[in-house]
Design a protein with these regions (language model features):
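Alpha-helical protein-protein interaction scaffolds
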Residues: 180-184, 188-196
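Amphipathic alpha-helical scaffolding segments comprising HEAT/armadillo-like alpha-solenoid repeats
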Residues: 129-132, 142-146, 173-185, 204-215, ...
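Catalytic cores of enzyme domains
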Residues: 1-132
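Structural detector for internal amphipathic alpha-helices that build alpha-solenoid repeat scaffolds
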Residues: 161-171, 192-202, 224-236
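Alpha-helical scaffold segments
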Residues: 118-122, 219, 223-225, 229
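Short inter-helical turns and helix N-cap capping residues of alpha-solenoid HEAT/ARM repeat scaffolds
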Residues: 157, 187-188, 216-222
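Flexible internal linker/loop segments at domain or repeat junctions
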Residues: 127-158
Length: 237
């Protein structure tokens, strides 16, 4: 993660692979399913560099991207990238919350669709399911420890709860309403914030007034979100 290191440049110039249209570094047989890094040593190596690697006319990663974040070759529009937003500490825009769908963490559509990486799918993608209710019932620190290999903004497990709320609201079950209502009493303003949106998403926004003390709410972030959602309801009537 150090910008002073030219990992991608060294990777390509050493003949290990090439940069795909998804912006991922690809290798024959592995595709994008790899991590690259540098080891600096006081020795020179002669390397026969192959420069004939390329994606050619393939654009499956661009076709598979659910938001159009890869519409331009070799450019990733992070503002449209689901994986970026699920790891961001910033407020996720309303349109992106919709597009996140049932995803809890990350989005691998561009990796899964990449032909050179088909052999890595079975190896790296075994069990991708999570229990969203379990996530929401866990303490923040428990989540940080449980998913310690994840990048979690500010090492705050409430961001994982945020992701779970969005996924749950986009794919509600019979108990989703009660789950979201219970979260309105959370001590975390982040959890309360997205729970309000979650109830709006499943058509239960009017119940927020019964369980959330809006008049005495001190969080400006929550008050603004409540007002915004309220205006969206009336603008659609």
């Amino acid at each position: 993660d150090n910008p002073k290191h030219y990992d991608r440049l060294f990777f390509e110039q050493s003949g290990l692979g090439w940069q795909g249209k998804s912006t991922m570094m690809l290798s024959p047989g592995k595709g994008p399913w790899q991590l690259i890094g540098n080891i600096y040593v006081e020795k020179k190596f002669d390397v026969e560099v192959k420069k004939d690697y390329s994606c050619g006319s393939c654009n499956l990663c661009q076709i598979s991207c659910p938001t159009g974040a890869l519409d331009d070759d070799f450019i990733l529009d992070s503002n449209k990238c689901i994986s970026y937003w699920l790891q961001s500490p910033d407020i996720i825009p309303h349109d992106m919350r919709e597009k996140i769908g049932n995803r809890f963490y990350g989005c691998d559509e561009c990796l899964i669709s990449c032909p050179p990486g088909q052999g890595g799918i079975k190896k790296f993608n075994t069990d991708t399911s999570v229990d969203l209710n379990q996530i929401l019932n866990s303490e923040s620190q428990e989540l940080v420890e449980l998913y310690n290999w994840f990048y979690i903004p500010k090492r705050n497990g409430d961001y994982l709860k945020r992701n779970a709320i969005i996924a749950l609201a986009n794919n509600p079950s019979s108990d989703t309403r009660e789950v979201l209502i219970s979260l309105l009493k959370s001590q975390s303003q982040l959890v309360r914030f997205y729970s309000i949106w979650g109830l709006w998403k499943i058509g239960e926004f009017e119940i927020v007034n019964q369980y959330l003390d809006i008049k005495n709410e001190k969080s400006e972030m929550i008050l603004q979100e409540y007002q915004r959602l309220n205006e969206m309801i009336y603008s659609n009537k």
